[in-house]
Curated annotation (Swiss-Prot):
GO terms for cellular component: cytosol. Its EC number is 2.1.1.228. SUPFAM superfamilies: alpha/beta knot (SSF75217). This is tRNA (guanine-N(1)-)-methyltransferase. Homodimer. It catalyses: guanosine(37) in tRNA + S-adenosyl-L-methionine = N(1)-methylguanosine(37) in tRNA + S-adenosyl-L-homocysteine + H(+). The keyword Methyltransferase applies. GO terms for biological process: tRNA N1-guanine methylation.
Amino acid sequence: MRFDIVTLFPDCFTSVLSSGLLGKALAKQIAQVNLVNPRDFTTDKHRKVDDEPYGGGVGMLMKPEPIFSAVESLPILERREVILMSPQGQTIDQPLLRELVSNYEQLVVICGHYEGVDDRVLHLVTREVSLGDFILTGGEIPAMALINGVVRLLPGTVAKTESLTAESFEEGLLDYPQYTRPANFRGWKVPDVLLSGNHAAISQWRYEQQIKRTSDRRPDLLEKWQQEKKPGSREQGSREQGEK
């Protein structure tokens, strides 16, 4: 997977791209990240990338010319998506990440800044994506989240592939509570069922905890899951857990 990140602040990505699973994935060439600064494509001596909006208004907008030039300088792979990070876009979720991994080999990610971008930039864009219903100073942090979410789904990034399918949101529910040693910490004890060695009972407990936690914290997800779940999914999961 190739990522081309169009950003006025490429240095923001340095530590993120060199650490953790993301850094390892890049080192193993599972993914490639190319940082492109639209300021490098300006033609005036001040390297101006923003200007006042027509009709008046607060703040400055990113000009279209440097963004177009930056994107048009990039190679075009056969399966390419051009994404604008925007609060008006589709919210990042696990189905979106899986779709991007399955369908594309190149993601061009444009990070807006100031009060946004000239609307004509949308002629370049095939999709707008948002981190959530709130405003940030720029698209860099949402872009980092998008890259991280996509890369960890690429084959070879996570050593144990079952770790991916057992996480929150992958089955439509939040994850169950998890514990490690010690079994008793300041009076808070690990549930007995997890110490029992009974895999079927553990699987059932985890399933029940997923339902409870999702109901308590994200009832909207539980409602969606109840509408979409397939008959037999729990029983199949229980059998798989019991066979391990």
